[in-house]
């Protein structure tokens, strides 16, 4: 596997780790997950309000750093995600190799386009298939907008969700992955609380995401 494809594949693993490695249509999960945690009524109301606010503000972006490992392979890079409703524009960059790739697509249609690969861009009606052919990894990009914001967890096919004292997801178990929301960006006048540090693991695969900045349009 070339260095370009290997680095992109590892970054793809990071996205897959945060998403549970399964493509599930938005809002069409399986059985309801087991929700664990003693949460006050005020905390439940606050979390309901947080999720409602996020669903009412579909234009947002974040910049962060990702570190991943699987077996003997590992790597790190930067991730710049921009979302406008169902449309996304994601830039992946590896500072060590000074290489970057751009993924664009639409979560409604499922179509996507990947640029920055040897041989030119690749596009198709199924963004996940485009990525699979380019990297060898199945990456459920259509679920990422909800997962990185800890939004609609119950609809994403999770088997178990542990809540913290504020009613937010603390740990999510899905399809062999354990995803921990370890740190949150405090709420401000412009936006509610959002995940800052997320770690995911599945066997010898480990993923760490640190969000440096969230930006949400009013």
From Swiss-Prot:
Task: Report the principal subcellular site.
Answer: membrane
Question: Which purpose does this protein serve, as stated in its record?
Answer: Plays a critical role in the incorporation of lipoproteins in the outer membrane after they are released by the LolA protein.
**Any Pfam family the entry gives:** LolB
Question: What Gene Ontology cellular component terms go with this record?
Answer: cell outer membrane
Q: Lipid attachment of type S-diacylglycerol cysteine occurs at which residues?
A: 21
Q: Which NCBIfam families match?
A: lolB
Kindly state the subunit structure of this protein: Monomer.
Write down the superkingdom of origin: Bacteria
What range does the record give for the signal peptide?
A: 1-20
What protein name applies here? Outer-membrane lipoprotein LolB
By which gene is this protein encoded? lolB
Q: Name one GO biological process term.
A: lipoprotein localization to outer membrane
Which protein family is named in the record?
Answer: Belongs to the LolB family.
Q: Where in the cell is it found?
A: Cell outer membrane
Where are lipid groups covalently attached, annotated N-palmitoyl cysteine? Answer: 21
Annotated membrane topology is:
Lipid-anchor
UniProt entry keywords in alphabetical sequence: Cell outer membrane, Chaperone, Lipoprotein, Membrane, Palmitate, Protein transport, Signal, Transport
Q: Does the keyword Signal apply?
A: yes
């Amino acid at each position: 596997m070339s260095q370009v494809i290997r680095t992109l594949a590892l970054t793809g693993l990071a996205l897959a780790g945060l998403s549970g490695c399964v493509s599930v249509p938005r809002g069409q999960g399986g059985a309801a997950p087991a929700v664990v945690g003693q949460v006050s009524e005020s905390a439940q109301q606050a979390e309901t309000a947080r999720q409602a606010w996020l669903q009412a503000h579909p234009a947002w972006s974040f910049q962060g750093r990702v570190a991943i490992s699987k077996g003997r392979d590992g790597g790190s890079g930067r991730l710049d995600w921009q979302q406008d409703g169902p449309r996304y524009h994601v830039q992946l960059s590896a500072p060590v190799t000074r290489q970057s790739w751009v993924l664009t697509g639409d979560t409604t249609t499922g179509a996507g386009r990947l640029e920055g690969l040897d041989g030119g861009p690749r596009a198709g009606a199924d963004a996940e298939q485009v990525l699979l052919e380019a990297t060898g990894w199945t990456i459920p990009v259509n679920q990422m907008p909800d997962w990185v914001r800890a939004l609609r967890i119950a609809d994403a096919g999770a088997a178990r969700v542990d809540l913290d004292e504020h009613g937010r997801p603390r740990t999510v178990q899905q399809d062999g992955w354990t995803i921990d929301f370890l740190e949150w960006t405090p709420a401000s006048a412009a936006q509610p609380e959002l995940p800052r540090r997320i770690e995911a693991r599945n066997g010898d695969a480990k993923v760490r995401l640190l969000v440096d900045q969230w930006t949400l349009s009013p």
